Amino acid sequence: SDWKVDIANQIKRFQPDLVAMSSTEDMWELGMRVLEEIKDEKIKNKIPVIAGGVFATFAPELCIKYPYVDMICVGEGEKALVDLCKRIEKGEDYSDVTNLWVKDDDGEIKKNKISKLVDINSNPKIDLSLFEENRLYRPMAGKIWKMVPVETHRGCPYTCRFCNSPDQQRLYNQETGSSFFRKKSMQKVYEELKHFKDEFGLEYIYFWADTFLAYNKRELDEFCEMYKDINLPFWMQTRPETVTVEKLSKLQKVGLRRMAFGLEHGNEQFREKMLDRRWKNKDIIEACKVPKKLGIQFSVNSITGFPNETRDLAFDTIELNKHIDADNANIYTFAPFHGTPLRKVTEKLGLLTPEAITKCLTDTPQVVMPQYTPEEIEGIKRTFVLYIKFPKSRWKDIKKAEKFTDEGNKIYKELRIEFLDKYMPKPDSSPTSNVNDEVVLPNNTFEQGVEKNRYQDEL
């Protein structure tokens, strides 16, 4: 069907009192296209529009300029949205609702303060019945599973400079004196898991936490005891330095099927200086031996195209991944999202204007550098797993496959066929198999989606 017709018909049929749009930065322009399609109904019926999410939080001056956006939610939106709806329902003025920037008919903007943190243990469960059932199916390990995200943590205790967590912490500390990072109670997590499993027949769980193993020992033990009753395979992501044999052994016994590590870059000095990730390569390699030893399948996520990076530095990332030998290795283009420390670095270096909107990190590079061109970055990305899996004696051919020429494309196609034949495992076991059954390499589509949203919280 035509989405433009669908959205226009929905607006006419539903006749909303408010249109709310939660958007990450790379989805912002699509959101504006949607608003463009409903502008006639918006103007005719005087329907206010609010936009929220991490992009609106960290680029409010930019977002509020758009003609069809009347309000911006800065920070968490659960309480602010409820307060706004209550005011609209009663026909009351809502220009002073906390967390909101409200634009009047003359274009004047009232910027309200941020209120205290939302109690994430009081939030209602996600109403999955609002969505078509096919929205619950996602790829994992070469199979399609019925799964949903379950939030266990909000925010992150670490300060990676490509991520919004440092600025999120700074914002809430300055405005409210509070730490944005917190953990949902185990009872609340259990209630949500039990509800989703019993009411919607879920087959797989993925935990929505930037660093799942930010749990301390007591909390992890509580989780494992709680999860015995759920008994579904699950996926989580964490940092290498949080891993121990004891932790992963406990999680494996209750259903840990797959996990992902954020490696990001292979050069120790560059990783520390540019990314604020202070760990030695030898320690990362040792940490990644733990899931391999236990038979837990894992993927490693890396990024390339950082400011001041070079092709040689990118090969340090390839070399480290080669030593780790994960079941799956993903690489993404650096995305200088608003609200990240590296966005400021990128602008200071003159590589982006403050108004530039960053696209998806699986898209072509927006940061154009003479020493490491977009074409080189794209070439490294497409041959990344080939460099990792094939012996170095094949690197000469792989380098040719980096080029997007007739010859390069031909060589890449041949190498890809060989790669799939030698290194691509069979799909995972069925949804009804025991959670401790053998596991295999996943299709990385799902994990790419999770990685993309690591840096961007929703409204």
Q: Positions of the model-derived regions?
A:
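Conserved strand-turn element in the central/C-terminal portion of the radical SAM core barrel
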Residues: 1, 212, 266-271, 275-277, ...
